[in-house]
Amino acid sequence: MQQMTDVSKGDQSKDGQGKGDQNKDSAVNYHHGNLRLALLDATVAQIKEVGVEKLSLRGIARIAGVSQTAPYRHFKDKNELLAEVATQAFIDLYQATSQQLTPQRTTCKNIEATALAYVDFAIANPERYKLMFGPSIQNRRSYSNMLAAGERSFNVLISQVEHGIEEGIFLNDCAMILANTLWTQVHGIASLIIDGFYQNRELPMPFDEFLRIQISIASRAIQINPTAYTASRIANKTDRQVRFD
């Protein structure tokens, strides 16, 4: 496989000496195709450093250790680069949630497992998660790969809702509407967590259980005959207050 090297060469001066020669020690060698992945990682790193509003291709190149022109070999502008970061994030989210599905679980338990994996992904990847669903990417409809990856990740939930409808567990309604009802609940919880809403707040139980109960209650909204769920289960645990830090 052809090897591609990006060195911060800088502009050539009249005597032929490259202005970037002083940076040769920081040059990074990439096999063909790896530069693209390195730029995606560098993008997330710079978002953590300065925020998406101050993101620049020059800063991304600096973090990746390549020339300032290197990002343009793969992406025409910052927006296209952000769309690609989101695309990869949707792919990773699909893998994180779909691997939770198993025939040994009931449909409701599969939904609970995928929902927890969804929240875990958001907590582990707050910058990418906000990019996936936030307003930073312009003209989102122009990026077919990103849209397809997003649909695929959402279809993990839709497929389970369809199973529930076929089994007579869920309301016999549009699967997309029912799935969206569940997703908005889980997405809202994930967003509150990564925005710090639960930091230093006292909860009536360990946070993992707090989260599971919310997801379980949310799934009952689309069930035909949801099992009884009373507040006593929560009330009995009020002596185990913890903080989510």
Indicate where each model-derived feature is located.
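Hydrophobic alpha-helical connector segments
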Residues: 98-128, 172, 176-182, 229, ...
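Amphipathic alpha-helical linker/stalk segments
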Residues: 88-112, 142-151, 160-166
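Helical hydrophobic small-molecule/effector-binding pocket
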Residues: 112-133, 155, 183-190, 194, ...
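Short secondary-structure transition hinges
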Residues: 127-159, 177, 200-204
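C-terminal peripheral helix-coil segments that are non-catalytic and often amphipathic
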Residues: 1-11, 15, 20, 154-155, ...
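Generic hydrophobic, amphipathic alpha-helix propensity
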Residues: 35-43, 60, 85-89, 93, ...
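Helix-turn-helix
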Residues: 38, 49-80, 84
